[in-house]
């Protein structure tokens, strides 16, 4: 039996232990702001190759670990990665983002989708997560991640990134039965995928429902929340002790609803004051976040001030320090280094 204090720091906090400082990692900590990543991208221009070739995905996942020693190392992947495994092919064009052609628009297309068998369709995930666990040992927590049903449905139905989500909203409000049957199938597949990631070594898994912030609260309750809850329920039946995090961009209007999803930790974006978030979610709910990633373009004194402000507002215990969104392209690497160094000494600075 592993002693609690032998477990990695972030995992201990995610499970409810109170420690001297909040653990720290960054969404998108492996990526284009790092020169080593850009050099690798120039050599391997296909995003899918970088995220699905185990050697490359492992190397990229470990780049921020080697540079900054964050308390969390997240698998380098994409939220769309499991879709071909249920019958939805996609491609990622470097300047345009994901393309799904043909997009899902009819009940007949939904009916043709099949269950996810990750062992056969996503075998590289086992290699990536297993190797990351070996590489970081108990020095850091290995995180898996998935897209939540509404957001994956938005990509699959729109066929690409969208500014107004007109196509999926048209389906939601004129043919809701098609959308509900699609969301249900995605929820089952994502639950299988999360369980597989945990089986392969993920110690914490983050669900990204990036586009659920585009929904009104009543539509969130209809089209996003029930399917988040289904994923969480199916995962917790098999892995009750694995902490789950939910992140939504632009979530100020639905924050309390996120707390009803069943996850252990709500990742708060920077548009919500952290003290308000803690009050709105209740003291039992753990939180993650939520410094504005734009702060990392400021002076080091300013960055330090904002780190301390966020940690102070989050209060004692139940907080994983992070940005309120992914780190931005062009962020100075020295400022990222300073962010991690400062966050790791925060108990001495407050």
From Swiss-Prot:
Q: Which InterPro entries match?
A: UROD/MetE-like_sf, Uroporphyrinogen_deCO2ase_HemE, Uroporphyrinogen_deCOase
Catalysed reaction(s) here are:
uroporphyrinogen III + 4 H(+) = coproporphyrinogen III + 4 CO2
Query: EC number(s) per UniProt?
Result: 4.1.1.37
GO MF entries: uroporphyrinogen decarboxylase activity
- One record GO biological process: protoporphyrinogen IX biosynthetic process
User: Which residues does UniProt call coiled coil?
Assistant: none
Residues under site feature: Transition state stabilizer: 78
Per the record, what is one GO cellular component?
Answer: cytoplasm
Which principal EC class is assigned to this enzyme? lyase
Function in brief: Catalyzes the decarboxylation of four acetate groups of uroporphyrinogen-III to yield coproporphyrinogen-III.
Spell out the protein name for this chain.
Answer: Uroporphyrinogen decarboxylase
Q: Which organism is it from?
A: Synechocystis sp. (strain ATCC 27184 / PCC 6803 / Kazusa)
Please spell out the taxonomic lineage of the organism that makes this protein: Bacteria, Bacillati, Cyanobacteriota, Cyanophyceae, Synechococcales
